């Protein structure tokens, strides 16, 4: 009975495979939205105010960071929790594949969230005259919470690695 339960639990990790594949579909949706924004801005580029262009560019950078986060979670999560990626030797392989454990993935995700939050906060500050003060305050508090969380996770990771 114990062996059956252990084998069933171990095999259940494959339930995550379609979830990681779903992230690739989310990446396609993000790419479509990215290019939709490019197509939308190009005809208007000469009539746009500089600040409006910067806001669009920050949105594109934001989407790019989210896309990188999706790729990182998709591949690292699959390799850490489901199975190793079997990529042939003659194909280009990302140098971090197979080297990122769950803890380093968590730290990279936290750093990415801080970067994404920073871009979002910058976009909000560029339009600060149209944002109520209490809402600005909450944006800053939420961003600082992300920063503090990422710092604490990195610090705790360093402590546990140092003690082992």
Curated annotation (Swiss-Prot):
Its main location: membrane. InterPro entries: UPF0114, UPF0114_bac. It is a multi-pass membrane protein. Keywords: Cell membrane, Membrane, Transmembrane, Transmembrane helix. Pfam families: UPF0114. The chain crosses the membrane at residues 15-35, 53-73, 136-156. It is found in: Cell membrane. The keyword Membrane applies. The keyword Transcription does not apply. GO terms for cellular component: plasma membrane. Belongs to the UPF0114 family. This is UPF0114 protein YqhA. It comes from Escherichia coli O6:H1 (strain CFT073 / ATCC 700928 / UPEC). The gene is yqhA.
């Amino acid at each position: 009975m114990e062996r059956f339960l252990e084998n069933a639990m171990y095999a259940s990790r494959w339930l995550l495979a379609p979830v990681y594949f779903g992230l690739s579909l989310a990446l396609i949706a993000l790419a479509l939205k990215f290019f939709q924004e490019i197509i939308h801005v190009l005809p208007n580029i000469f009539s746009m105010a500089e600040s409006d262009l910067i806001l669009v560019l920050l949105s594109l950078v934001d989407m790019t960071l989210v896309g990188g986060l999706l790729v990182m979670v998709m591949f690292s999560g699959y390799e850490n929790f489901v199975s190793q990626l079997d990529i042939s030797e003659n194909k280009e392989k990302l140098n971090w594949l197979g080297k990122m454990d769950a803890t380093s993935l968590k730290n990279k995700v936290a750093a990415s969230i801080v970067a994404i939050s920073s871009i979002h906060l910058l976009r909000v500050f560029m339009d600060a005259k149209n944002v109520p003060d209490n809402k600005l305050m909450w944006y800053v508090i939420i961003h600082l919470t992300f920063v503090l969380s990422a710092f604490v996770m990195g610090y705790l990771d360093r402590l546990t690695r140092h003690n082992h």
